[in-house]
Amino acid sequence: MTARKPFWETKSLNQMTVPEWESLCDGCGLCCLVRFEDEDTGEIIPTRVHCQLFDEHRCTCKDYANRKKTVPDCIKLTPHNIETLEWMPPSCAYRRLHEGKTLPLWHPLITGDRESVHQAGVSVRDQTVSELSFSDPEDALDFVATDLMYDKSDVDWDPEEP
């Protein structure tokens, strides 16, 4: 008997069910960071400042179901807008699958462990500050973090080491 391939290898993003789509999120937290766009160059500038609803230790949204009410500019990822979201980190499963790439070895769907993204050092767990810490949103520019946006898909990670 041959093993059945996982859904992310057999379905397009458009064909996935809502639970399948949601399970692609590795929980790194990179998409919950405040970003700026340089008006002259169009360059996206990531920061170590997270959305007010982001739980910096769990790397999850504190009110995912209602997030758009509190944070109207929160972008809901869909199969229809993923190609326009060039600011998504290169290691993001949504972006990788859209680009025809595989999931990284540390991805929770591969490991079966939601902690693997943190153990591999890919997430922003406990490395960010809340946007609520600033009276002026532009102060987030003091926390520019271009280092967070390099491709972490192939990090040297040993699942046996904590």
Curated annotation (Swiss-Prot):
Xref: NCBIfam families: PRK05170.1-5, PRK05170.2-5
Family membership noted in the UniProt record: Belongs to the UPF0260 family.
Name the record gives this protein: UPF0260 protein Caul_3920
Gene source species: Caulobacter sp. (strain K31)
Cross-referenced Pfam families: CxxCxxCC
Disulfide bonds: none
